[in-house]
Structures are given as structure tokens and as C-alpha cells.
């Protein structure tokens, strides 16, 4: 199956016209839709998206994201197992710049045998994933 993990960096690039990756995000998203890719994300990524969209773009943009974009994602709801494995990965990475949200996304992607990510965050390619953005 053509499954792609979606990161906050791609969501923000898609929604923010002034984002440096906006045009690339639009092209990638259009291609993913044409390919009928299964888009998965984590509940942690959604929380991060809601927080950043609300703060940077306002409540109208948050409502639009919730109504039009969030339903496109299959959400992997994070439990204590994924959370703990994300923390382990975070500690093992020895990188102060890697976030728990990203570490948990790595865990979920590997659990689902996902190799491709819709992301502009270099942590994903450094972790061995292929960026589609």
C-alpha cells in the first residue's frame, strides 16, 4: 500500500503561503492525492499542528484544518508503549533538537512499515525515511 507519514512541518508548509516550502508542499500534496496515498499521522503530531496553527494562523485556520485536512489522515493514537519507545529513541538519539513528537512518529512509521514521509524536517531523512516533499 502507498502509505506516507505526515509531519507537522508539511502541514504548516501547506497552510502557510509565506512558508519557504509552501509551493513544494502544494505540489507534493497534489501528487499524494492523485496517487491516492494513505496518509497517516500521530495523535501527537495533530496536537502539535493544532497548537501551532492556532497560535500562528488563528482560530479560523484551525477550524479549516480540523474540518478539511485532519479528516484526510488515518490517526495512530499514541498509547503508553509508543510513548515510552519514543522517549527511549529520543534519549538514544543524543540530539537536543529531536522532539518527542518526531521520535514517536519514527516509532509509528517503523511499526507500520512506512518508508516515505511528507515532511520538511531534516530529522526524518536523517532517520532513514524518504521525504516526498
Feature map (PLM): residue ranges:
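Short, well-structured N-terminal submotif of metal-dependent ribonuclease cores
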Residues: 1-40, 54-67
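Acidic, PIN/NYN-like endoribonuclease modules and their adjacent C-terminal/linker elements
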Residues: 1-3, 46, 106-107, 111-133
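Short beta-strand scaffold positions
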Residues: 6, 40-41, 77, 100, ...
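Hydrophobic helix-cap positions at the C-terminus of alpha-helices
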Residues: 31-32, 69, 89, 93
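Short active-site oxyanion
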Residues: 35-39, 72-74, 113-115
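Active-site neighborhoods of divalent-metal-dependent phosphate/nucleic-acid chemistry enzymes
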Residues: 75-115
Amino acid at each position: 500500500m502507498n502509505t506516507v507519514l505526515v509531519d507537522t512541518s508539511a502541514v504548516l508548509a501547506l497552510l502557510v503561503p509565506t512558508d519557504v516550502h509552501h509551493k513544494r508542499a502544494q505540489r507534493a500534496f497534489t501528487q499524494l492525492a492523485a496517487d491516492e496515498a494513505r496518509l497517516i499521522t500521530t495523535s501527537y503530531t495533530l496536537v502539535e499542528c493544532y497548537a501551532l496553527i492556532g497560535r500562528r494562523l488563528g482560530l479560523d485556520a484551525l477550524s479549516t484544518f480540523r474540518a478539511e485536512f485532519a479528516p484526510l489522515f488515518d490517526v495512530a493514537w499514541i498509547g503508553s508503549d509508543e510513548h515510552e519507545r519514543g522517549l527511549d529513541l529520543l534519549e538514544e538519539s543524543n540530539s537536543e533538537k529531536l522532539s518527542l513528537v518526531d521520535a514517536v512518529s519514527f516509532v509509528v512509521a517503523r511499526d507500520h512499515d512506512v518508508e516515505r514521509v511528507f515532511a520538511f524536517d531534516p530529522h526524518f531523512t536523517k532517520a532513514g525515511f524518504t521525504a516526498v516533499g
